[in-house]
């Protein structure tokens, strides 16, 4: 029965992903063991996502959790699981995610409090910030991650996320103008991703003046450990460089530097003080070492991909208490994450609207690049407005539509359903 419980957890995970990506989807829990049953399944209509989430919440609570016990060794943190990773902790996290989507704050707190009992105090001692880097496989903080392994002559099960999250490789271990030791020399020169300016930027103002551009001072990671370097006549502004003294002090321009910067943002070789070209010229980072794969061969990324971790659950508790208008508990859980990051706590209560914004921004900082942000923005009903407002690319802006909050069900599946399945939001948007 524990194996059946794990299967229920995996089913819930798949439907969590489906409802996050497609919204309402066909839902069934029966065995598809005949051609007739397959034909029936193909013609199922969309089931409202909130109904799917509630049914799976109940299923996990009643039919999965009871089979994960101390006696059978399965009531444990994911890092302590001997032969599986999709057990008790993941079940609790999925229940909490389902409840948050359905705005059932008390319902979400039940599994979140169980996770807190299981994982204990959230702090640097128990959960080192350095271990949020994906190169650390199944650390204590993990709740669920995709398992990878790759070696030239052994197991080869890998992804390629690191190849688009590392700075552009110029060859011979030089990444965007900076030699990086320990990351190999064979990674292809892929077009790497970069967050928009809302996430992190330190760009000097136009002209021969050492002042910050006022249009970019509301970045989520602010300040960055960057300082003015030399005036560039072509750019008509100062270039910037890593400030090693500020990094060592943990403070720059009178403000604390978020400890997450060194892992989540790629500014250059922080130890050597060598700055990436894109950072030097434009004041923006690449994705950071959190995503980089040591000794990567070609694009074979052997890191595990972190899907859920304890910091996420802590911030979910803050969100629940905020919606229940409990300011004291909201700030307590929010500040657990901020304390580990080494930034000042939120102590001045100015209203639940401000607290809501603080939680949303903290989730962006803490969980950036961990496959959750779009789901959060859609869940909060602000995906289109926020994405449109902060997208730097004018061409991309022209193609964005509110219906893009969800993917359309593919035409092939709509046809197989006899067009019981449709994409009404896309049709209403003229697509």
Language model segments and positions:
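An aromatic- and glycine-enriched ligand-binding surface/loop that stacks and positions planar moieties
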Residues: 29, 57, 61-68, 85-270
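Short coil/linker segments at helix-helix boundaries
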Residues: 24-50
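Long, intrinsically disordered, low-complexity segments
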Residues: 55-57, 132-192, 198, 297-307, ...
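C-terminal substrate/ligand-recognition segments
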Residues: 233-337
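Extended, hydrophobic/aromatic-rich amphipathic alpha-helical segments that build helical scaffolds
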Residues: 1-27, 53-68, 81-116, 144, ...
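Glycine- and aromatic-rich loop/turn segments at beta-sheet edges
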Residues: 24-27, 31, 65-80, 121-129, ...
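Extracellular loop and loop/strand-boundary signature of outer-membrane beta-barrel proteins
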Residues: 40-45, 81, 302-303
């Amino acid at each position: 029965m524990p194996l059946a419980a794990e299967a229920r957890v995996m089913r819930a995970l798949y439907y969590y992903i489906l409802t996050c990506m497609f919204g309402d989807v066909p839902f069934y829990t029966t065995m598809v063991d005949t051609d007739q049953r397959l034909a029936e399944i193909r013609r199922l209509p969309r089931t409202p996502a909130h109904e799917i989430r509630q049914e799976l919440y109940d299923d996990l609570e009643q039919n999965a959790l009871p089979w994960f016990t101390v006696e059978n060794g399965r009531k444990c943190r994911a890092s302590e699981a001997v032969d599986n990773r999709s057990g008790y902790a993941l079940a609790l996290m999925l229940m909490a995610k389902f409840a948050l989507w359905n705005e059932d704050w008390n319902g979400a707190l039940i599994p979140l409090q169980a996770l807190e009992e299981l994982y204990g105090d959230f702090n640097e001692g128990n959960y080192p910030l350095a271990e949020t880097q994906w190169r650390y496989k199944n650390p204590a903080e993990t709740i669920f991650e995709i398992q990878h392994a790759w070696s030239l002559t052994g197991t080869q099960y890998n992804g390629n996320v690191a190849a688009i999250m590392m700075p552009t490789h110029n060859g011979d271990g030089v990444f965007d103008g900076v030699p990086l030791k320990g990351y190999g020399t064979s990674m292809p020169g892929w077009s790497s991703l970069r967050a928009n300016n809302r996430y992190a930027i330190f760009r000097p103002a136009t002209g021969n003046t050492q002042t910050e551009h006022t249009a970019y001072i509301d970045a989520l990671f602010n300040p960055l450990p960057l300082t003015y370097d030399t005036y560039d006549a072509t750019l008509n502004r100062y270039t910037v460089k890593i400030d090693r003294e500020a990094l060592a002090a943990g403070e720059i321009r009178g403000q604390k530097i978020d400890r997450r910067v060194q892992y989540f943002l790629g500014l250059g070789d922080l130890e050597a003080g060598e700055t990436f070209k894109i950072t030097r010229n434009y004041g923006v980072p690449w994705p950071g070492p959190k995503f980089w794969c040591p000794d990567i061969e070609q694009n074979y990324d052997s890191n595990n991909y972190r899907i859920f971790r304890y910091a996420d659950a802590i911030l979910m508790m803050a969100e629940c208490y905020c919606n229940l208008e409990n300011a004291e508990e909201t700030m307590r859980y929010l500040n657990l994450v901020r304390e580990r990051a080494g930034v000042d706590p939120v102590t001045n209560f100015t209203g639940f609207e401000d607290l809501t914004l603080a939680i949303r921004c903290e989730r962006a900082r803490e969980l950036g690049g961990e496959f959750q942000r779009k789901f959060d923005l859609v869940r909060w009903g602000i995906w289109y407005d926020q994405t449109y407002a902060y997208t730097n690319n004018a061409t991309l802006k022209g193609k964005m539509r509110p219906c893009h909050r969800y993917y359309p069900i593919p035409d092939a599946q709509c046809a197989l359903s006899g067009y019981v399945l449709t994409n009404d939001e896309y049709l209403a948007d003229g697509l």
